[in-house]
From Swiss-Prot:
Homodimer. This is tRNA-cytidine(32) 2-sulfurtransferase. SUPFAM superfamilies: Adenine nucleotide alpha hydrolases-like (SSF52402). The keyword Metal-binding applies. Keywords: 4Fe-4S, ATP-binding, Cytoplasm, Iron, Iron-sulfur, Magnesium, Metal-binding, Nucleotide-binding, RNA-binding, Transferase, tRNA processing, tRNA-binding. It is found in: Cytoplasm. Catalyzes the ATP-dependent 2-thiolation of cytidine in position 32 of tRNA, to form 2-thiocytidine (s(2)C32). The sulfur atoms are provided by the cysteine/cysteine desulfurase (IscS) system. The lineage of its organism: Bacteria, Pseudomonadati, Pseudomonadota, Gammaproteobacteria, Pseudomonadales. Pathway: tRNA modification. Gene3D superfamilies: HUPs. It catalyses: cytidine(32) in tRNA + S-sulfanyl-L-cysteinyl-[cysteine desulfurase] + AH2 + ATP = 2-thiocytidine(32) in tRNA + L-cysteinyl-[cysteine desulfurase] + A + AMP + diphosphate + H(+). Its cofactor is Mg(2+); [4Fe-4S] cluster.
């Protein structure tokens, strides 16, 4: 890649800055960490690896990076692409070979979305492998738009207010998951991926099918952003500005104990005495 244009340089700086801010805000990476970067071959994970390699050079702390890809034995998967790329940039890597493709095809009826089961099988395998290699952090490539889409998916279809946290402790307490791109917009990542000419590998398991519910939410957010530029960022900031007393979850706020405080100073004027 040659000299960057002004806009390309701004894009690179923005992604690096936002990733650095997310890592700092949530204390994602600490001195001495071994970060397992989960590399799928998509634009998000390539961008995450690229940014982490840069931050590794300039950060005031020392941490190790190891890239891990899971070969799920999908027909036509170009298994040479990732090793060739990682060797070309000098990054240590592991390829996990596990035939989850056959499991998914066996369990999911023809025509149904395979994303959910595929994701669970992959996540479980990666958790186990991170433990085996002594990784202290497991980095995933989810970005701001993924997090917000998940929030609306859970609200619309699951009746719960939750998203993807930038930092997560696994249920068994053995893995810490981090999402360094949590503050980055998908459009920026797409542009950065094209700029860097990453060797993208499409998902052939399902013919690159979209999860239909997620696609509906994605299109909704895109339409909102088109009509009101900046709305997506405002909504994302709302996830960091939660007021439990203004919601209705009795587990988060003790509504039953609310009582009038007779000793409190009145906030309003006595209009009848004016």
């Amino acid at each position: 890649m040659g000299t960057l244009s002004v806009n390309q340089n701004k894009l690179q700086k923005r992604i690096r800055r936002l990733a650095g801010e997310a890592i700092t805000d949530f204390n994602m990476i600490e001195d001495g960490d071994k970060v397992m970067v989960c590399l799928s071959g998509g634009k998000d994970s390539y961008t995450m690896l690229d940014v982490l390699l840069y931050l590794q050079k300039v950060a005031p702390i020392k941490f190790e990076i190891v890239a891990v890809n899971m070969d799920q034995k999908q027909p036509g998967f170009p298994e040479h692409v990732l090793p060739a790329y990682l060797e070309s940039i000098g990054v240590a890597y592991h390829i996990i070979e596990k035939d989850t493709y056959s499991v998914v095809k066996e369990k999911i009826p023809e025509g149904k979305t395979t994303c959910s089961l595929c994701s669970r099988l992959r996540r479980g395998t990666l958790y186990t492998y991170a433990d085996e290699i002594g990784a202290t952090k497991m980095a995933l490539g989810h970005h701001r738009d993924d997090i917000l889409e998940t929030f609306f998916l859970n609200m619309f279809y699951g009746g719960t207010l939750k998203a993807m946290p930038p930092k997560l402790l696994s249920d068994d307490g053995r893995n810490v998951v981090i999402r360094p791109l949590a503050y980055c917009a998908e459009a920026d990542i797409e542009a950065y991926s094209q700029l860097k000419e990453f060797p993208i590998i499409p998902c052939n398991l399902c013919g690159s099918q979209e999860n239909l519910q997620r696609q509906v939410v994605k299109e909704m957010l895109q339409e909102w952003e088109r009509k009101s530029p900046g709305r997506v960022e405002i909504m994302f900031r709302a996830l960091q500005n939660v007021h439990p007393s203004q919601l209705a979850d009795r587990n988060l706020f003790d509504f039953k104990s609310l009582k009038i405080d007779d000793s409190a100073t009145p906030r309003f004027l006595d209009v009848m005495s004016l």
